[in-house]
C-alpha cells in the first residue's frame, strides 16, 4: 500500500511537470495552423491637382500635401511591407494652375511614377472634357475602373474597365469602381453620351462576379460621397445595400475620417468605408489580415498627414 502511494505521488509529480511545462509554452503552439495573409491598402481621394504643398503663407494648410512627401512615404511603406495596393477614388483634376495649364498631364504622370494600381473617375475629372481625359490616359500606367458609367460612343470607349483582380501573394483582391450622377453636377457637353447607371445595382453585380472568380477581398472605389441628408445614393447607402463588398474607398465629400466607418451589409457582415480629406494632404493606410476562410480583420487604420506645417 505504501509502495502504491509512493508510485502514485511520483506519477502525479510527472503529470504536474507536464502541465506546468504546457502552461509555459507559447499559446500559438496549440492554435490553429490556418494560414493568415496580409494586405495593406494605401489610398487617396480628391487630390485636385495639388502637385505641390500648400504655400508657406501662415494659413491653416501651409506646407501640407504635395506629391514629393506622398511619394517618399509610399516608397518607405513599400520597402517595409510585402503586399501593398495603392488606390485613388477620383477627382484627380482641377484646383490649381497646373490643371489650367496642362490639363491633367502632370497629375497622371505623377501617379504613374508613384505606382498607383488603380483609380476611379470623379466629376471634376470631366472638367477638361472626355477627349482631354482620354488623351491624358496615354500617360497612365494604371487602369481607370468604373462599372456604372456606360462610355460607349464616347472618347473613353475601351479606356475604362469595370473591375480588376490583383494578385498579391496568395491573395486575389478584386477592385471595382462607381461614379456619381453627372447630370446637374457636370455640364452636359463635358460628359457627352456617358450613360449613368444605378451604382448599387452595378456594384452588386460586379462584386458578385468578383466573388465567383474567387476573390479573397472586394474593394469598391467610390466617388459617390460619404452620406447626405436626403435619399441621394452615397457610400453609406451602398455599404448597407451591398452583399459582397468588404471595403469602400470614398471621395467627393472631402471628409477626413478619424477611423473607417463600419456598416452591416445585406449579408449581415461588415462593410467598411474610409475617406481621407482632400488636396493630397493625407495618405490613408489600412492593414488587413485575411484567413484561408476569407475572414477579414482590420489590424490597423491610419491617415498620414503629409508635408510640414509652417509654424510662425
Regions found by a protein language model. Give the residues of each.
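Hard-cation-handling environments
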Residues: 312
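Acidic, metal/ion-coordinating pockets
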Residues: 3-308
